[in-house]
Amino acid sequence: MNTQQRHSWGLAFGLCLITLAVNLQAPLYTTYAQLSGYGAAATAVAFSGYVLGVLPVLLAFGGLADRVGRKPLILAALGLSMLATVVTMLWPNLIALGVARLLMGVGTGLASATSTAYMMELMPTCDARSPANRVTASTSLGFGLGAALTSLFLLALPSVTPGSFWLQLMLAALALVVVWRLPDPAERIKHAPLLRLPVFPSGSLPYSFSMLLAWATSGLVIAILPSVLAAHDLQQWSGLSTFTVISCGLVFQPWVRRMHPARATGLGLLVLPLSYALLAWGASEGSLPAVLLGALGASSACYGFLYLGGLSAITAMAGAQKARVTAGFFLFAYVGFSIPVVVTGLLADHFGADVALIVFGLALLAGASITGLLIVRTAAFIAQPSHG
């Protein structure tokens, strides 16, 4: 392995450990809520602390890496991931979870603002997709792996501070050393603008809204599903469902890359409501195979068809404003990761989990149908020959 490859894998290791901490506590959400005396809505609010951390950093400090360099932001993100884990180890309750999610949101925002650019500088190549694919793979694996590890430790020994927390701290400390030794070749620009407001090119909104639907579904699986599974004594498996709904989407990405963006997004909007229906039915009936199969289908849509298809489409529309257009795309995604999840939690507290899951499913079906129709019409209009 040459030096460039070694450096790129070192950065990928650091990025994986940053995102591994994000959903590390997911299988314990219901336990934290019970210990704190709160319900599904409060759990969803604590879960959304992540978005409150990540969005301001992405928007208000998007140009920070140009001023201070790439490596300091990755090191800061690793430190915040460790601090967030320590907070929930010392105070295993819902308020501490909200604080930890906020810290992890800030850390992920710092890493997201520079990770792809840093990877491209460490592994120079004619094909810009290779660095981006390595960043996507390492972060997607981390997002799901943390929850899966906690589930495995809980199956072996129930605890509010499982061994996965200690494992994350040890691996993140190792990642700090690895990233510290990486070069940082980017030129510093002292007066680079920090603020990068989002831009939405004509025709991009349906693709952005499809990401809102996708991440709302994955957020529901992470934040609300554990309490539904707990009613059937399946809470310890919620980490596996989180891993499935996030990380298994990687399997579908090579296929999606060969598809036209509009076709990929349209297929994702078809798969998502069907997969959610199976997942919600399995959770209500206590059928773990149905939950995992539905989560796998949702993952193919959320982190395969809709993510790559939508990102490819809006990037093609962006022109010279790629960074700001991408910020707008993820703004929709993070709104979906918070507001619909909180609303569903409120419905679950007042009307029961089954009603909340049905209402979310109907809204998802309506949103996917309308968005899919808009994408099909936009694609058909663009494909028409000009008669100017």
Predicted regions mapped to residue ranges:
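Helix-breaking motifs and short loop linkers at transmembrane-helix boundaries and internal kinks
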Residues: 37, 69, 90-96, 282-286
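Central cavity-lining transmembrane alpha-helices of secondary-active solute carriers
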Residues: 45-62, 112, 116, 243-255
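Conserved MFS/SLC helix-loop-helix module at the cytosolic interface between two early adjacent transmembrane helices
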Residues: 55-94
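Cytoplasmic helix-loop-helix junction between adjacent transmembrane helices
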Residues: 100-139
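Helix-loop-helix hairpin linking two adjacent transmembrane segments in secondary transporters
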Residues: 125-180
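Symmetry-related core transmembrane helices of the 12-TM Major Facilitator Superfamily/SLC fold
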Residues: 163-179, 357-374
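C-terminal transmembrane helical hairpin of 12-TM major facilitator-type secondary transporters
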Residues: 263-310
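A late C-terminal transmembrane helix in Major Facilitator Superfamily
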Residues: 311-363
